[in-house]
Amino acid sequence: MNKIFNLGSVDQYNKLYGLETLNPLVSVINLNKATRQMNYAHWHYGIYALYLKLEKACDIRYGRQNYDYQEGTIVCFAPGQDAETTLITDRVQVNALGILFHPDLLLGTSLGKTIKKYTFFSYEVNEALHLSEEERNIIMDCLRIIRLELEHGVDKH
């Protein structure tokens, strides 16, 4: 039987891949910088995760079906969801970017009240969000800007 990784924090995920945590509630990840990788993992998400898959480096089982994704698409998971990943490359670093955030980040916000309405966080939708090249560039720019903000630490007011 394989171990289930209960992801209750972004720090847990970062430690599994040897990535740095700059903020306990949100993390921009670059799996090209991973120092560890798992050939197989069963994830139980307690956080939100959006991955921009720049290559197809693993097979993903989501709920009871395979997740349909390809290079250049976004794969999304929400708290309470399970996914299994099986690596299909022998490299530690894979070409994927993403953002992980704890549900507490959304407390008291309008997004926190409406995020469950977004169908890309639903088991019924087992297909990744397909993006144009321009949309991929926008996502990568946004992740870069968020990462820069995280590197500056907490503002003192």
Question: Model-found features: residue ranges?
Answer:
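Generic protein-terminus/edge-of-domain signal
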Residues: 1-61, 65-67
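Short aromatic/basic micro-patch
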Residues: 44, 76, 100
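Residues immediately flanking
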Residues: 55, 79, 101-103
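Histidine-centered metal-chelating micro-motifs
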Residues: 75, 80-86, 106
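Short acidic-glycine-tyrosine-enriched beta hairpin
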Residues: 64-78
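Basic/polar, acidic-poor N-terminal "presequence/leader" segments
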Residues: 61, 81-86, 91-92
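Polybasic "coupling" helices that flank or enter modular domains
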Residues: 156-157
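A hydrophobic/aromatic-rich effector-binding and dimerization subdomain
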Residues: 16, 20, 88-152
